[in-house]
Curated annotation (Swiss-Prot):
PROSITE patterns: G_TR_2. This is Translation initiation factor 2 subunit gamma. Residues 9-203 form the tr-type G domain. Heterotrimer composed of an alpha, a beta and a gamma chain. GO terms for cellular component: cytosol. Its EC number is 3.6.5.3. One of its GO terms (biological process) is formation of translation preinitiation complex. It is an enzyme of class 3 (hydrolase). The gene is eif2g. Its cofactor is Mg(2+). Residues 146-149 are annotated as: G4.
Length: 411
């Protein structure tokens, strides 16, 4: 058991989504013991800016049968049995950070929509995050009605009715609604049981060519490190298919920017995996699920400060195409989501600049042609993606980018 435990990798990614300050990070801490806001600005402002990952083990008590994430049952003190390891992706709920949430959404196998019981439902980002889940086609959703310690029974029931009304006709229509207090750990066992029942581990084919979406990239060298001690750049993200091994040669697309005749172009790069980290451990092989860190031979200058975020990693010659222009079959929403007042979505116009989220990448696209339910765009930064993939489309309204629909990449 001890040996197996050492190398356990999370097998499913669960997004924590919802309006700013409704308790996503507190709930992640209640489930995992990890406070995911570690960015200095996050601690100062009390909101999540970057995407945080934290793992937890889903366990069941062999004595009382209750679920928890702890080796010893918090309810009766007996040992618990390991079921599976899951990874929580804590997304920003602040409206200015919606595009960051969409990048994380592309890695989610399920989601917990956190809704505070002490505020009217829905709040703007509650609506926006649910729409984001709908756009990416995510149906494995649980609703955590949080902060029930702040309201009386009547208020909690009124809020429950508002939630039921809000989810009618959406992908979350049949989602279980679980009242909890993340702060006091109340009803967390019921939530963990719901995760086990409603967010299954997807069937994955490890024989497919590996593909990893890069969410973060780092230079882990401290200033003043002597040259012989420098280590290569690190890529952080999630494997969506296949597996990666230490020693593998990998290609990164669209790669790194360079200038040619005054224009910025991108060139794919190849490197070797020198180390792999999953679940906080160094491993020889990594699979889909959880955050994976790849140590490479890349110049750390290329990976510092998330410069490689939005790239796709795989075996050389096996990755999807890189697009500098996209043709999309467009599906627009009726109304703009995320704004306090309801606005109708205007049709897309020629020469309009839209923000596109493609996997973990985001890029601006200039609309060059319009057809019936189709548009063509010239991209500011190229993207690596499969034909048929979904792309979230946002438009600038006022000073913010607002989700207005999605597109499907056409050949």
């Amino acid at each position: 058991m001890g040996e197996k435990r050492k190398t356990r990798q999370a097998e499913v990614n669960i997004g924590m989504v919802g309006h700013v300050d409704h308790g996503k990070t507190t709930l992640t801490k209640a489930l995992t013991g990890v406070w995911t806001d570690t960015h200095s600005e996050e601690l100062r402002r009390g909101i999540t800016i970057k995407i945080g990952f934290a793992d937890a083990e889903i366990r069941r008590c062999s004595n009382c049968g209750r679920y928890s994430t702890s080796p010893i049952c918090p309810y009766c003190g007996h040992e618990t049995e390991f079921i599976r390891r899951v990874s929580f992706i804590d997304s920003p709920g602040h409206e200015a950070l919606m595009t960051t949430m969409l990048a994380g959404a592309s890695l989610m196998d399920g989601a917990i929509l956190v809704i505070a019981a002490n505020e009217p439902c829905p709040r703007p980002q509650t609506r926006e995050h649910l729409m984001a889940l709908q756009i990416i086609g995510q149906k494995n959703i649980i609703i955590a009605q949080n902060k029930i310690e702040l309201v009386d029974k009547e208020k909690a029931l009124e809020n429950y009715r508002q939630i039921k009304e809000f989810i009618k006709g959406t992908v979350a229509e049949n989602a279980p609604i679980i009242p909890i207090s993340a702060l006091h750990g109340a009803n967390i066992d019921v939530l963990v049981k719901a995760i086990e029942e409603f967010i299954p581990t997807p069937k994955r084919d490890s024989n497919k060519p590996p593909k990893m979406l890069v969410l973060r990239s780092f230079d882990v060298n401290k200033p003043g490190t002597p040259p012989e001690k420098l280590v290569g750049g690190v890529l952080g993200g999630s494997i969506v298919q296949g597996k990666l091994k230490v020693g593998d040669e990998i290609e990164i697309r669209p790669g790194v920017p360079y200038e040619e005749h005054g224009r910025i172009k991108y060139e794919p790069i190849t490197t070797e995996i020198v180390s792999l980290q999953a679940g906080g451990q160094f491993v020889e092989e990594a699979y889909p699920g959880g955050l994976v860190g790849i140590g490479t031979k890349l110049d750390p200058y290329l990976t510092k400060g998330d410069l490689m975020a939005g790239n796709v990693v795989g075996k050389p010659g096996k990755l999807p195409p890189v697009w500098t222009d996209l043709r999309l079959e467009v599906h627009l929403l009726e109304r703009v989501v995320g704004t306090e007042q309801e606005l109708n979505v205007e049709p897309i116009k020629r020469k309009e600049v839209l923000l596109l989220n493609v996997g973990t990448a985001r890029t601006m696209g200039l609309v060059t042609a319009l057809g019936k339910d189709e548009i063509e765009l010239k991209l500011q930064i190229p993207v690596c993606a499969e034909p048929g993939e979904r792309v979230a489309i946002s438009r600038q309204i006022g000073s913010r980018w607002r989700l207005i629909g999605y597109g499907i990449i056409k050949e």
